A protein has these predicted regions:
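Short, conserved secondary-structure transition motifs
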Residues: 195-215
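Long, structured ligand/cofactor-binding scaffold of large enzymes
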Residues: 1-45, 49
């Protein structure tokens, strides 16, 4: 799950490698396509502090931060005063690309109301325009956005001093999936020929970026790692949670801080309820109700020290505020290490 520490994730990966299991994260039903697109295109990024200090143009593409992460605009992106943005919101231009009207689009300077599932076509048209060519007129009918509006948006992006695009699930879950994200990252690379531009992913959980970072560092792949052959294999669509459950290839599951059944298709959730489940969680949820064994979780960064990745992929280390309330475990990492030790003893 995305609400546990990187140390716990590392312990889970080590346990999965020893057992020859498949280890996956919540990214598989969330921002997995974003991680795939990032690995395809490469990323030009920056810390949240750099964007706060420098950015005079903010683009929210397929995201609605005022409802998803309400503090994002006020703390990092739009309203705070930075060194080169001393007047806060008055020194910034905000563009929202979203099929629907939202609170974020109402508070933007420009709203691009594209048709649903046409992110790929709009990004392709912008890349065509940035290369000095005209896109095919049919793109207006497909995307619902006029070429003149695209040109206006592109000019705003090229003329800014420092721009940042925040992509959300809207771009990663529409038709095209990771190819949409790949084009967005390529657009940012092309914009850097004209000005300074970076891109960031808006995630929902406190450590949603942590598993991708930890797994990529240790094994080279961001999610969906299969250790059945003794070494990591990666093939989204085969070794990922939804596909394994749909094909009924899983005979048991260990879930850590993950209310997984809330995000799964009905067929997968029904099969998940049929197999043995061990759950480590701090909250009562639908997954704890169907689990065979429930181990109480420890609140990372509150009841134990931990490391978590911020939305801009910066690791944040936190000390504990209070001690773990349990005498049998200090943290979720400690729980997994105890399970790992017992597993080794049994397998011997």
């Amino acid at each position: 799950g995305g609400e546990t520490s990187c140390e716990t994730m590392k312990a889970g990966l080590n346990l999965g490698e020893y057992l020859g299991a498949v280890v996956d994260s919540i990214a598989t039903v969330c921002h997995g396509p974003s991680a795939m697109g990032m690995q395809e295109a490469g990323r030009i990024g920056a810390t949240a502090g750099q964007s706060k200090t420098r950015a005079d143009l903010v683009v929210y593409w397929g995201s609605n931060p005022l409802e998803l992460v309400p503090r994002h605009m006020s703390r990092y992106a739009v309203y705070p005063r930075g060194y080169w943005t001393g007047r806060g919101r008055f020194d910034r231009t905000v563009i929202t690309v979203d099929p629907r009207k939202s609170i974020t689009s109402e508070n933007s300077d420009l709203h691009i109301p594209l048709m649903p599932n046409t992110d790929y076509e709009l990004l392709s048209a912008l890349l065509t325009l940035i290369h000095g060519k005209k896109p095919h007129p049919s793109v207006e009918e497909i995307t619902g956005v006029s070429i003149s509006m695209m040109e206006k948006m592109l000019q705003m992006m090229k003329n800014c001093k420092y721009g940042v695009i925040y992509v959300g699930l809207g771009i990663a879950s529409s038709y095209g999936k990771h190819r949409n994200v790949e084009l967005a990252f390529n657009l940012v690379k092309e914009l850097n020929a004209h000005t300074k531009f970076v891109i960031s992913i808006l995630r929902g959980y406190c450590n949603a970026a942590g598993f991708s970072q930890t797994a990529s560092y240790l094994y080279g792949y961001p999610f969906g790692l299969d250790f059945a052959r003794g070494y990591p294999r990666y093939n989204p669509g085969e070794f990922t949670t939804v596909d394994l459950l749909r094909e009924r290839d899983v005979d048991s599951a260990l879930l850590i801080s993950s209310n997984l059944d809330a995000y799964l298709p009905a067929v997968c959730a029904e099969y998940l309820a049929e197999i043995p489940i061990i759950c480590i969680d701090s909250f009562h949820s639908s997954i704890t109700l169907i689990s065979d064994v429930v181990l109480p979780g420890v609140f990372d960064s509150i009841e134990c020290e931990s490391t978590m990745y911020r939305f801009d992929d910066m690791p944040i280390y936190s000390k504990s505020i209070i001690a773990s309330p349990f005498d049998f475990t200090e943290s979720n990492e400690h729980t997994l290490k105890q399970l790992f030790k017992k597993t080794k003893e049994i397998k011997r």
